[in-house]
Design a protein with these regions (language model features):
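Structural and coupling elements of P-loop NTPases
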Residues: 1-183
Length: 183
C-alpha cells in the first residue's frame, strides 16, 4: 500500500572474511544468490506503479557491511573512487563493479569474459578486484597483526588514525579502520 522501494543490506561481511575465510569470488557468488532469492520474493509483489523495484548493487539498492562493527558501503561508494582514478563516469563504473565484468590491468581494458584470448590466467571479477579484495586484505592484515602491511594499505587508502585510535589492535582496530575508510 505504501509503495516503498526496497533496499537490501548484506550483513556480516566481516564474518565471511574472518571466520569463514571466504575468498572474494565466493563472497560474490553468495551475495548474488541471496539477491536473486530476494528478487524472486519482490517479483511476487510486483506493482506496476512502482516499475522495476528489484534490488541490484549497480542500481544502488544493495549495501554490504557489518552491523555489529558499524560499517557499510554500496557499490556507488567505490565507483566514485575508481571513476575519478580512471577518468570515467561514476554511473558507468557502478555498472562495471558488479556482475560479469573483468578488468585486464595489463591491457587496461574491460571485458565480460573471465579469461579472454591471450590471457594465460583468468581475470578477477571487478567486484572482487576493486572492492572485496582490498577490504579482505586490510581486515586480514589487521587481524593477523601484520603491521607493515596494514599500515602501508592505510596510507595508500588515506586512512588516518587519530588520538587513542592509534593504540588500537585486533578487532577494535579493524572496526575503527573500516568505519573511517568505508563510512
Amino acid at each position: 500500500q505504501e509503495r516503498v522501494r526496497p533496499c537490501l543490506f548484506m550483513n556480516k561481511v566481516d564474518r565471511c572474511i574472518l571466520e569463514m575465510q571466504m575468498e572474494p569470488e565466493d563472497m560474490f557468488m553468495r551475495f548474488r544468490k541471496s539477491m536473486e532469492d530476494v528478487n524472486v520474493i519482490i517479483a511476487t509483489y510486483n506493482d506496476e506503479l512502482l516499475g522495476d523495484i528489484q534490488v541490484a548493487p549497480e542500481k544502488g539498492t544493495v549495501a554490504f557491511g557489518s552491523g555489529l562493527h558499524g560499517w557499510g558501503f554500496n557499490v556507488e561508494r567505490f565507483a566514485k573512487i575508481y571513476a575519478s582514478k580512471m577518468g570515467v563516469d561514476k554511473d558507468k563504473m557502478m555498472k562495471r563493479l558488479w556482475g560479469d565484468n573483468f578488468f585486464n590491468a595489463k591491457k587496461k581494458t574491460w571485458t565480460n569474459v573471465m579469461q579472454p584470448e591471450g590471457c594465460t590466467e583468468p581475470l578477477q571479477r571487478a567486484f572482487c578486484q576493486f572492492i572485496m579484495g582490498p577490504i579482505a586484505q586490510l581486515m586480514r592484515a589487521i587481524m593477523n597483526e601484520d603491521k607493515p602491511k596494514y599500515e602501508k594499505m592505510m596510507t595508500t587508502l588515506g586512512i588516518v588514525l587519530k588520538g587513542d585510535d592509534r593504540q588500537l589492535l585486533g578487532k577494535p582496530l579493524m572496526k575503527r579502520t573500516m568505519q573511517i575508510w568505508i563510512d
